[in-house]
UniProtKB/Swiss-Prot annotation:
Its EC number is 1.3.7.7. Pathway: Porphyrin-containing compound metabolism; chlorophyll biosynthesis (light-independent). It comes from Staurastrum punctulatum. The keyword Transferase does not apply. This is Light-independent protochlorophyllide reductase subunit B.
Length: 513
């Protein structure tokens, strides 16, 4: 355990609550002290939804510590059962309340005797897993619970649908553009003549989980959440799954071809023909997606060789690295992820597309790396946006965790062919246009702008005299930071504490030599 003012992935109970609050008519009870109950506020602030967050905190206070939690937890479960009439109540402790080592499964069993709702305890180790791993595990646990229940009630043996159909697994609350991506995937499947059987957990009903085996295959757009469920369904029901993320022209085509491959196993029997989506891929790539011709335009060629850094969750960071390097000719200096548990897959995906791979959940390491490589643009999470502002480097947000501006009201998917257009816009608009800053300074656009330096350190042991500062301000903005850093580096190496114009020229000569 460590103290941090920023975490890329939150504690395990946040993942469990995200899954529970994504389903319709499911209530979560969080057994936690005050301070751990911020999920309601966070979700209400960020998600553009009208409904209240269905999460109740069962507070661990001094009375609970003195008498034990059973009475209070059982009372909260039965009260919510009577008030809300949910289909399912999920009880989760937090990492703090786990210290009490209470038998919460016993509390759940007690409450289930008097409740009309189903009651389960989230089966998550709060010290071993983070938010994303816990969400993946909880979703699989809920699906397994309801399919086992349907099996016991003998209403599970349903034939697969007559037309090709899919389940979309892993769309959930507070995800990065998840709702827009879901709409785009539904539109894509409609174009291909594929029926969407169920979408879980976002907007899904636990009572409909027994319908999951009716689909021909499962779609897992994001590796972080949904993979465990897809593996369970494959093992128990023989359902194939596609885990390729349809992000970018190349991977969207690969995604559609994988679906075609799986559908054609059943199509000759059930449809009397095989399906062929090649014409659709060609049509979308050449005429619907603007990204293919944009990547050949002079605007995109201006980006060729520009340096970029990519950091985020494994799904988005890997996909973005491949799009930049393969489809846009951008030079990715470093690609990284905070999902340390999936590091091997990430390294395998970005191999050959970037110079350096960074696997860390420490934002200071990411900041230091960005300051060191000095990219022209960053593609990352909310934290990389902050780092970019401090270093005066533009940043495009491509991954959770994000703030309110990345829960847009307008339609902005990142998946599918419309997603390729959004990504092309994001990439192009993230790079500072050549002489823009310099021209603004020349014509008085930024007359109050200070001379900036790209460094994460706020302390400097060097002073610049007025003449050298005036000389520095004459240098164009897009190279000024580099010259300032090189001069300061030269001064430190030679034991100088005050920088003059002469030292600036000496540093320039030393660098050229």
């Amino acid at each position: 355990m460590k103290i941090a003012y920023w975490m890329y992935a939150g504690p395990a109970h946040i993942g469990t609550l995200r899954v529970a609050s994504s389903f319709k008519n499911v209530h979560a009870i969080m057994h936690a002290p005050l301070g751990d109950d911020y999920f309601n506020v966070m979700r209400s602030m960020l998600e553009r939804e009208r409904d209240f967050t269905p999460v109740t905190a069962s507070i661990v206070d001094r009375h609970v510590l003195a008498r034990g939690s059973q009475e209070k937890v059982v009372e909260n479960i039965t009260r919510k059962d009577k008030e809300e009439r949910p289909d399912l109540i999920v009880l989760t402790p937090t990492c703090t309340s786990s210290i009490l080592q209470e038998d919460l499964q016993n509390f759940v069993d007690r409450a289930a005797m008097t409740s009309q709702s189903d009651v389960i305890l989230a089966d998550v180790n709060h010290y071993r897993v983070n938010e994303l791993q816990a969400a993946d595990r909880t979703l699989e646990q809920v699906v397994r619970y309801y399919l086992d229940k349907a099996h016991r009630q003998e209403n599970l043996n349903q034939p697969i649908t007559e037309v090709p159909s899919v389940n979309i697994i892993g769309m959930f609350t507070l995800g990065f553009h998840n709702q827009h991506d879901c709409r785009e995937l539904k539109r894509l499947f409609q174009d291909l003549g594929i029926k969407v059987n169920e979408v879980i957990p976002e907007g899904g009903s636990v009572e409909n989980l027994r319908n999951l085996p009716k689909a021909w295959l499962n779609i897992v757009p994001y590796r972080e959440v949904g993979l465990m469920t897809a593996l369970y369904l494959e093992k128990e029901f023989g359902m194939p799954y596609v885990a390729t993320t349809p992000m970018g022209i190349v991977d969207t085509a690969k995604f559609i071809r994988e679906i075609q491959h799986h559908i054609n196993k059943w199509a000759p029997i059930l449809l009397g023909k095989v399906v062929d989506y090649e014409e659709y891929i060609d049509q979308q790539t050449r005429f619907v997606s603007q990204a293919a011709w944009f990547s050949r335009s002079i605007d995109c060629q201006n980006l060729t060789g520009k340096k970029a850094v990519v950091f985020g969750d494994t799904t988005h960071a890997a996909a973005m690295t491949k799009i930049l390097a393969r489809e846009m000719g951008v030079y990715v200096v470093c690609a990284g992820t905070y999902c340390k548990h999936d590091a091997e897959w990430f390294k395998d995906q970005v191999q050959g597309f970037c110079d350096e791979v960074l696997i860390t959940d420490d934002h200071t390491e990411v900041g230091d790396m960005i300051a060191r490589v000095e990219p022209a643009a960053i593609f990352g999470s909310q934290m990389e946006r902050h780092i970019g502002k401090r270093l005066d480097i533009p940043c495009g947000v491509i991954s959770a965790p994000v703030h309110i501006q990345n829960f847009p009201l307008g339609y902005r998917p990142f998946l599918g062919y419309e997603g390729t257009n959004q990504i092309a816009d994001l990439v192009y608009n993230s790079f500072t246009l050549g002489m823009e800053d310099h021209l603004l300074e020349i014509f008085g656009g930024h007359d109050t702008k200070e001379v900036i330096t790209k460094s994460l350190s706020t302390d400097s042991d060097l002073t610049w005299d007025p003449e050298s500062q005036a000389e520095l301000s004459k240098i164009p903005g897009f190279v000024r930071g580099k010259i300032k850093r090189n001069t300061e580096k030269f001064a430190r190496q030679n034991g100088m504490s005050k920088i003059t114009v002469e030292i600036m020229y000496a540093a320039k000569e030393a660098l050229n030599a």
